[in-house]
Amino acid sequence: MSGGQPIFLPGVPEDKVREVYGRAAGNEIASGKFASPQSSAALAANGFGWFLDRPSDCPLFPPIADLSAPVRAVEIERELRFPWSGGRHPWLDAVVWTDTHVIGVESKRYEPFRGSKVAELADAYDRDVWGEAMQGWCAMRDLLRTEPRRYKHLDAAQLVKHALGLATESNRSGLSPVLVYLYAEPQDACRSPQEAFLAHRREIEDFHAIVSGNRVHFAACSWRGWLACFTREATNHARAVRETFAP
């Protein structure tokens, strides 16, 4: 993938993607970030954008494939608002809707391998508004305050905020919430990629152990693992994603 103009793969509705990003916080297309050879937004927008007009073709992620519910809608760059008006609210790279679940997706490409993460969580997240069975997520929130450098590769604070946004959406919609962490492992990510990939996966496992069993279900999957699930016409799209973005 080379820099310059934003890349839109065949079958990805460019006008719709541009419209969505034009409304979103940061507008990565207008800012030029989308055209970067290492753009995370370009990977997410192309990977999920193909399903905007054909959501039923979107496969569920391997860790939650047992949901076996048909996908009814796919959105990209979607804001999930907290139960208050002011302040910042989480933006997820994609949201997948079924008749029973709302599945928020946080996609990562090079970010986990670019410097250590320091967690910061405002006092606003202490409000008792998240509903039942959120103890694990609240425990992670508190843990990150006492150990803000617990994770080097994983942006755990961002995931906590996303989970709280999904909990709020679940309270509104009545759908069961799932947060999927979809990560790439680009071979040019750093000087010792295999070592970094292993460390990243271990951090994911540690995080998962703390938040598992809660109302917002957490699952993690590699981009390559998800692309391997594409079937029929989508297999050509999966091939194009792999060849263009090497996730």
What are the roles of these predicted feature ranges?
Residues 184, 193-247:
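Polybasic (Lys/Arg-rich)
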